[in-house]
């Protein structure tokens, strides 16, 4: 089972949302969305909407007259997001593959993807597909993680899991941190006919977080739970080891940070 397949069969979005959302993902969502004008040059498409953290920020920021289309490959994630944001009018939901978007050419004025492109098998193809559905001059906003060494909470989890499953390629969880090179990002953007790329490093502090909450989010709240259970290892055992590693690195309550890159570009 590949990491991509695990993502598609993942069934624990509530752990992701409740344990990682408030301290890690929502602050980055706020930083990403504030870079979008309230009236971009057309409707807005979100790829890999997950549990809806970026979606909520987008709907609150955008002019109410603009259509917001939120998509994800995972029906489970979409169902969770819809349940969380059902009170928000003006959001359309659709299950969609980022490599085969079910929309016509030049259908949107902006496309937003928070921490999703790293998991797409062909990132260049995804960006070309993004360019296809954007109007000329349309806005692209992405967030990706910086190096895993700049994310000590993630490093702690990766080290524990890789030590528990040595030599197991599926259990090497560095993939989310492989797009940290600005030169690579600019190359991919240029190859998909995006211009005027701006890339900013952003650090979000963790203040007084519970190590076990972070560990629970990292294990039960991500597709790695599917891969661990497939190997017959109790999730609580792994969570306990990750929590201990986090406490060793950052104390209890845990103090540290998450670091990512915020990317802006225009469709050429």
State each model region's role.
Residues 10-23:
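Class I SAM-dependent methyltransferase Rossmann-like catalytic core
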Residues 43-101, 125:
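Class I SAM-dependent methyltransferase SAM/SAH-binding core
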Residues 109-123, 146:
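A short SAM/SAH-binding and catalytic strip from SAM-dependent methyltransferases
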Residues 124-139:
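A short glycine-rich, Lys/Arg-flanked "PGG" loop and its adjoining helix->strand segment in the class I
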Residues 139-167:
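Conserved class I S-adenosyl-L-methionine
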